[in-house]
Structures are given as structure tokens and as C-alpha cells.
Amino acid sequence: HKFSEDGWDKVMDLNVKSIFFMVQKFLDLLKKNTTPDNPARIINIGSIDGINTPYYENYSYSVAKSAVHKLTSVLAAKLIKDNIICNAIAPGPFPSKMLGSAVEHDYSIISKKNPSGRVGMPEDIAGLAIFLASRAGQYTVGETITCDGGLVASAGHDLTND
């Protein structure tokens, strides 16, 4: 496959630059009224494709999501002194337009190959985000947490071949 430079830039801009410049824009607001006992939170969305080498040739997406994970740790290291906690969630397979187009919206093969036996549900991400935004997640700083049904913890995540 050939990938266009414009396409690459669009994916990087959407996934990496947008996070950095949004944090920069809202930094004063994030700092306002925070304390060590009540910090502000930033929760970025990465992907397991930024952790493992994906099956599909989604070069820019994988690189961008890996950059999101690194940006998360860099921001966390710099912002914790201002009582701002930064973490990331790295989802695995969830029903979406992007994944759906790759599997013709038939998630059954992915479910069979996932150690959990299913694809993700909105509640899976919501629960993790609630934890990270709550007092219970307040001591978790700079982490990228997978939400993938065990794919990264297992041998890999090639969900397409039998």
C-alpha cells in the first residue's frame, strides 16, 4: 500500500497534535482550583495498536497512538507538580466505523479470537474512565491502561486468521 503524506499528517494532527495543543490551550483552566487532594484530570485515548504491532497496515494510526501514549507520560511528568493527572486508555476491539470496515461489520471472528470471547462495550471504557477520574484513580499517574479483553496480555492481536 502507498500512503499519502497528507493522510499521514491528518492522522497525526487528529491524534497527537490536537491533544498537545488542547492541553496547552486549557492549561490555566486545568490548574485552577486544583489541590493534591483534588487534582484535575486528563484522560487520553490511545490504542492497543500503539502497543502491539497490528495485523493491518495502519502505519500512521499505530504510530500516532504510540505517540499518544508517550505524550501522556511526558505530560504526566510535567503536570503532576501542578496537580494535574494525565493517563491514557488503550482500547482494543470495539464496534466502530474503522474496525467495522476492516471486518465488514462482522465482529464474530474478533470475538472468537479475543481471550475474553467478545468485543468491547461502551461500559468497559466508561468504567475505566470513571476510575481514572475518581478519587480511586488519583494515585495513577502517567499510565496507559489497556481495555482489550486480554489481547495485549496474550500472544498478540491478529484477529483475522483462523
Predicted features by range, described:
Residues 28, 77-78, 138:
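Alpha-helical segment proximal to the catalytic Tyr-Lys
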Residues 47:
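Residue(s) in the substrate-gating loop at a strand-loop-helix junction
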Residues 23, 64:
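Active-site helix of classical SDR
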Residues 118-147, 152:
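C-terminal substrate-recognition "lid" of short-chain dehydrogenase/reductases
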Residues 1-9, 99, 110:
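Substrate-binding pocket helix/loop in short-chain dehydrogenase/reductase
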